[in-house]
Amino acid sequence: MQFFSLVSIFLFLSFLFLLRKWKNSNSQSKKLPPGPWKIPILGSMLHMIGGEPHHVLRDLAKKYGPLMHLQLGEISAVVVTSRDMAKEVLKTHDVVFASRPKIVAMDIICYNQSDIAFSPYGDHWRQMRKICVMELLNAKNVRSFSSIRRDEVVRLIDSIRSDSSSGELVNFTQRIIWFASSMTCRSAFGQVLKGQDIFAKKIREVIGLAEGFDVVDIFPTYKFLHVLSGMKRKLLNAHLKVDAIVEDVINEHKKNLAAGKSNGALGGEDLIDVLLRLMNDTSLQFPITNDNIKAVIVDMFAAGTETSSTTTVWAMAEMMKNPSVFTKAQAEVREAFRDKVSFDENDVEELKYLKLVIKETLRLHPPSPLLVPRECREDTDINGYTIPAKTKVMVNVWALGRDPKYWDDAESFKPERFEQCSVDFFGNNFEFLPFGGGRRICPGMSFGLANLYLPLAQLLYHFDWKLPTGIMPRDLDLTELSGITIARKGGLYLNATPYQPSRE
């Protein structure tokens, strides 16, 4: 972690002051949850060296318990790693833990957290979430994007056919990211962006910097460290590029609306049109601004693209590592649609085993392993311990999904485990929370899932997939690339042979 390279710069100057502050705060502290030993200034940060945060925190929780306190520099934090404690935070005391801490990366890219996902709890957040649920991502709107999804899936299939016909390995990761980006852009903007590659790259860059464990987040009052680390400069540069692209799109939409032209990909409203319409709604408590629109679009793009693309790649990687699962899933798709020229989202509802594959993928590889952090709004007692106001709270859903107390053979990829199991991912089962729970459950869940099922089914139907020559399933690397979301590290390169169904 980069902050260690900066410790020597400020250690001597601040040591005496912070040591005094540390002693004073400890003498006045309440009964915090147990946690690992701390040192002045850095707190518990030395324990975070040597692994991905969700891995390290899982291992620490085995020693210190399912409700664990850490001092991350200046930030008091609590990590939740059990079903019962997750229920306390996300249901019993949901409203108390409904706010968000400041994460510098998201503060910059989301226009002072004026979006939905990272906005602090309050009337503004309630208004923005209502707009999202009622106007942007309601069931009707998600269904209305089905023809865009079909069109983008056709383009995806054609691009892979082109790759395979030339004998090239298919960069499955790249193709899926492009599909998810195009799908989200056309839904939000009505078109594929001219600067889509740059836009997507910069959003992913920010997501990779938004873990909340960097120097700018753990030492928020030491502004000179923000400058020295270079982190803020990187974020601002990424933000400027994203802002310019979104600003151009909004201005183009305004011109088209003024001229009576349609912006939507299919002649109706796209998401920017909806937000521009609401900008003129005088009944809103908080008027919609250009920055609000930009922040929501960044939310949509980040969540819509990352959730569907990372989960699709993980699903295919796990099927390649577990050939029996791949064979069973592909056989189901081809048997279900063997007499059909084409199939759509309604048809995909029949694919029960494919749904189990997705659920198992989300169990082992939740899009956001620690969820988006919450912030405690007032002192709260849980399980005999006090969680002070302003404490950052992380729920390790990655660890919950791999806990042998809740899952047999927890580290193995076995979709069949869900066949006779009523556990779902809608926030009601606290051992399985890939989209969170409570009032801050991911509002774009239905949009993300809709962009998962159809493309994966079509890919299984149209191609026979194999690992590159010389790579055995057991050798496939499933190393994670850390960030606020966890993608698979490196591209997934596969052989794709077009399928020619026999017509009898």
Curated annotation (Swiss-Prot):
EC number: 1.14.14.149
Highest taxon, organism lineage: Eukaryota
GO MF, one example: heme binding
Membrane spanning residue stretches: 2-22
pH effect on activity, per entry: Optimum pH is 7.5.
PROSITE patterns: CYTOCHROME_P450
Family: Belongs to the cytochrome P450 family.
Resulting phenotype, residue 368 to A/T: Decreased substrate affinity but catalytic activities unchanged
Record text on activity regulation: Inhibited by ancymidol and ketoconazole.
Membrane topology classification: Single-pass membrane protein
Residues that bind heme: 442
Pfam families: p450
Induction remark: Up-regulated 6 to 9 hours after elicitor-treatment and then declines by 12 hours.
The keyword Heme is assigned to this record: yes
Stored SUPFAM superfamilies: Cytochrome P450
Cofactors, names only: heme
Subcellular location: Membrane
Reaction catalysis annotation: (+)-5-epi-aristolochene + 2 reduced [NADPH--hemoprotein reductase] + 2 O2 = capsidiol + 2 oxidized [NADPH--hemoprotein reductase] + 2 H2O + 2 H(+)
Keywords, comma-separated and alphabetical: Heme, Iron, Membrane, Metal-binding, Monooxygenase, Oxidoreductase, Transmembrane, Transmembrane helix
Record's function text: Involved in the biosynthesis of capsidiol. Catalyzes the successive and independent hydroxylations at the C1 and C3 positions of 5-epiaristolochene. The second hydroxylation step is 8-fold more efficient than the first hydroxylation reaction. Capable of utilizing premnaspirodiene as a substrate.
Species the sequence originates in: Nicotiana tabacum (Common tobacco)
The protein, known as: 5-epiaristolochene 1,3-dihydroxylase
Gene Ontology, cellular component aspect: membrane
